[in-house]
Regions:
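Bacterial N-terminal signal peptides that target proteins for export
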Residues: 1-7
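Hydrophobic helical h-region of N-terminal Sec-dependent signal peptides
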Residues: 11-12
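C-terminal motif of bacterial Sec signal peptides marking the signal peptidase cleavage site
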Residues: 15-18
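N-terminal active-site segment of His-dependent metallophosphoesterases
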Residues: 20-103
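Active-site-proximal loop/helix segment associated with metal-binding centers of metalloenzymes
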Residues: 26-34, 47-50, 173-194, 242
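Extended active-site neighborhood of metal-dependent phosphoesterases/phosphodiesterases
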Residues: 36, 98-185, 203-216, 230-265
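Active-site neighborhood of phospho(di)ester-bond hydrolases with catalytic His/Asp-centered motifs
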Residues: 59-61, 85-91, 115-121, 187-191, ...
């Protein structure tokens, strides 16, 4: 049967209108807007901090589901003019849903200063890791601010059923020597700290030995447990500072100087 020519315009209008009614699957990794966010912001961090002898940065994490609190965090931090960058310790999503990553990216993009986001364990659910890689980049990455190297790691071993080397010791070993002439201090950041159940604790002590090979290791940062935590985990002088979740409306501010470092907790 031939389709009547007079009905073509009506059919075309219905087809176009129907396109707006298509509901994408929540795990479709259909990305709109900025991608490779960490790389773009790292370039800005390194440029802004070049030749600086004092670095001041914020750590926070676990903004999953707390959108209003995260938006308030951004507004609060934007009132300051003394922070160089932000490290988000991971878990921007609760269920690994694509839109969760996009919503959190758009909130964080309101910051007046650059930021990076680590991969959290909730970010690995469903197609979350794939979405994270598209929007933010590789889960293992590093950058240099002033003469401080920041090594950011995927430590979510349990989410991969131990099928991958997590933490990635090859990456760590390479980072010790990579651009070694450009830094003399180091900060290691992760979502899950050693001795948490989700960390690969079979290699916890090996992990600590590796990171202590970095020049001038200052301290480590983490998130994940939804409360603030400070402890010399291995009793070797290296402190671990764990950020609270955004629900509790606080974050860390670290200042690294030629003589050492200071930390404070800011509330909003």
């Amino acid at each position: 049967m031939k389709f009547p020519k007079l009905l073509y315009p009506s059919f075309l209008c219905l087809l176009i209108a129907g396109c707006d009614m298509i509901d994408y699957h929540p795990y479709d990794v259909h990305i709109s807007g900025e991608t490779d966010v960490n790389a773009h912001n790292i370039a800005q961090i390194e440029q802004n901090c070049q030749n600086k002898t004092t670095i001041r940065f914020v750590t926070m994490g676990d903004s999953q589901r707390w959108y209003d609190e995260t938006d308030d965090f951004v507004s609060h931090l934007n009132k300051r003019d003394d922070i160089d960058f932000v490290i988000h310790g991971g878990d921007v999503s609760d269920f690994g849903v694509t839109d969760e990553f996009l919503w959190q990216r758009d909130i964080m993009n309101k910051l007046k200063i650059p930021y990076v986001i680590l991969l959290g364990n909730h970010d690995c659910l469903g197609t979350g890791e794939e979405t994270y890689r598209v929007i933010f980049g590789d889960p293992n990455f590093s950058f240099i601010a002033g003469r401080v190297k920041f090594v950011c790691l995927n430590t979510n071993a349990i989410e991969f059923d131990y099928s991958r080397p997590i933490p990635d010791f090859e990456f760590l070993a390479a980072q010790i020597r990579d651009h070694e002439e450009e830094f003399d201090k180091t900060v290691v950041s992760m979502h899950i700290r050693p001795f948490c159940n989700e960390f690969n604790n079979n290699v916890a002590h090996v992990f600590q030995r590796y990171i202590k090979e970095f020049p001038g290791l200052q301290f480590c940062t983490s998130a994940h447990e939804h409360h603030r935590f400070e402890k010399d985990l291995f009793e070797d002088g290296i402190m671990y500072y764990m950020s609270d979740c955004m629900k509790n409306r606080n974050y860390y501010i670290f200042t690294i100087t030629p003589d050492g470092y200071e930390r404070e907790v800011a509330y909003y």
